[in-house]
């Protein structure tokens, strides 16, 4: 049987596979903020990125290894294709972390071997032990993935896995790369691996799933029963195409149904010992942070973290919940950190009170960042009577987005009405501090603002999405605006919040422009789509 750590290990790949969602690119400071929150959440492994992809990816993984990795913190992991260059870059990037891992992979399905790698099974079987052994010579912890394992020939899969373990892999990951399999099939695949790989007792079985058929979490829960003990997932289920298995759904399924799953870990059904190390009360906060920074809006009916997840419209349901919440709720909202708590802070509140509350919310700001956050708080308090935790989160998450700013919005002013043509005037500052002014008319105030900003920025783009929602209830609520721009097939998201949605839209547009400027011209390699390297072709 495979190694059994006695519980489920949560491997978070939000910063690697999750960031591959179109438009979800993150800058270094945003990645660091998410990694720090993932550590507070209690994940076991953070896959911080794909270091060989670009200098930016390398720097982000290295910074996370330096600042988030620790003796008691999560393992910091980097992804590497089965090539020496990838593996060496990965080892260098994760080197600062006391607990570090290289995650290397190669495809094993016939369709990938024929059309992507153009290699025979024998060639792949020769590459695997060589590259795993090389990775093992650089770090003590190596994970190996058989890309597209769910569509691979099981007998060949067993051979590859046996060779990888013999070469030093301590974790074997079985990905359903294209979201093709079903729960019963996936469970049988994991059980077959556990049974037919002779040295499987020397490694942990991990699984990685995509949600193309909406089955990722269901597949994972079946894999638990068959011996899988590490699960690779993302916050809010973000990822390529239909996304990845959602961390919050998997963790809460194991939490709510632990009486059912406990026996598969050799426990009594009523054992109170948690099946994961995740601090569930941090789930909602983590979900909001990832949504804010990536611009990926969480659908209202999303399980666990959607805005309607704990809402009841039916009168019968409302009556039952008022009498006993367990009549229609299987999860206490407080378990996942959902609270209506309002903080008693206002325009007379001091800097220390704001700092204390931000620390309680999990934000560790530098003096400069705190000064800026406090200034924004005071400005908001002048316009809004009650300040909520959501308001503070919106303030801080927007600050993080502005760390790589070529453009700074200095002023936005609009005039519009039933008999007026919407007109906007904006002032935009460049990196050198030089300010420029432009005015434009549009079909509405937001359109006019975007036209004026584009006239100053001079960066070709196409606006493909504009969305706005309220942070909290009330007529003075902050409005959250998300904007997506497209250029040369790439998507760039911007996000902002303000009590004035036109101001929020202007800032969100500027944030998206800054991402566009930073991202164009330095597109990163994709670990799967760019998997064929010259050295891989030569068998190195």
Swiss-Prot record:
UniProt name for this protein: 2-isopropylmalate synthase
Primary location: cytoplasm
Catalytic reactions of this protein: 3-methyl-2-oxobutanoate + acetyl-CoA + H2O = (2S)-2-isopropylmalate + CoA + H(+)
Organism listed in the record: Prochlorococcus marinus (strain MIT 9313)
Signal peptide: none
Region (Regulatory domain) residue spans: 408-540
SMART domains in the cross-refs: LeuA_dimer (SM00917)
Positions contributing to Mn(2+) binding: 17, 208, 210, 244
Entry EC no(s): 2.3.3.13
GO cellular component annotations of the record: cytoplasm
Family membership noted in the UniProt record: Belongs to the alpha-IPM synthase/homocitrate synthase family. LeuA type 1 subfamily.
Any coiled-coil regions, as ranges: none
Subcellular location: Cytoplasm
Keywords recorded for this protein, A-Z: Amino-acid biosynthesis, Branched-chain amino acid biosynthesis, Cytoplasm, Leucine biosynthesis, Manganese, Metal-binding, Transferase
GO biological process, one term: L-leucine biosynthetic process
Quaternary state and interactors: Homodimer.
A GO MF label: acetyl-CoA C-acetyltransferase activity
